[in-house]
């Protein structure tokens, strides 16, 4: 995609119903690295908005993506209103274009969308306390519960086979067979570790195929910084970054949160002696999640959550190892062996 210029940003901003002229700057907002995210203000500084250019290299169907976002946020809004909540703070709100659409396509093929800015909130970048992790868990569980009656099969798959662990394993075997970089000989222990767990990769998909667990609307990127928290009360408000909302399993969202939150070191820590799984944080998260999501889940689905924690970690580690074998093309690396360190940490 072409770099965003100020004229392009202003042109995109002028395509949305912001209630008056807005002021733009090229200062990027937030910690995300996929989309281009900016804050725009009304000229009178009465209100601000999030304006984003969707990364169409990653999300090749931005129209389908926004159909997902609009459908899910409408559903959430209705649930929040019925419960007496505040839909302007408890879910994302899409700002329509001047023509009533959900995204604007610029002359270069760039896809833009806008949201109301949720004021008075923070995103946690790491787990600072048990209370923080519990708050994130409760918010994600509530998100799951509110969408439990949404027809998941109607959603577009924005990234094909994203959490298909068996397919990720197959890709690993292809990369290993090709060994295009000649790296396989140096990672025999890691290869054996993954291969010993091939059967595990099929467990959740087999349960789904057997009808033991249901297809759900899942977020699929449940890092703790994708939850907005009220900066005054500390209450979890809403889940953001809905680009990967797709049909999936509740175990995926539960497991990915555990993968990132219950590991007490950086994802790319090179010293493996520092890597530990905090079982107590797992228990804290599980209790918080089930306190808000549990009413809509069967016993079999609740039991599947532990498998989610195991498989999301295995899947991510396998993806890092696959990328290492293929020459580090997918994940950005900052040093030799970076993806190998990431794989080992998982």
Predicted regions and their residues:
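Juxta-kinase regulatory segment immediately upstream of eukaryotic protein kinase catalytic domains
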Residues: 1-27
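Amphipathic, Lys/Arg-enriched alpha-helical patches that create a basic surface
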Residues: 344-346
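ATP-dependent phospho-/nucleotidyl transfer catalytic cores
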Residues: 3, 27-31, 52-53, 59-63, ...
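Conserved active-site aspartate in kinases
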Residues: 241
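Active-site activation/catalytic loop segments of kinase-like enzymes and analogous catalytic loops
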Residues: 251-294, 311-330
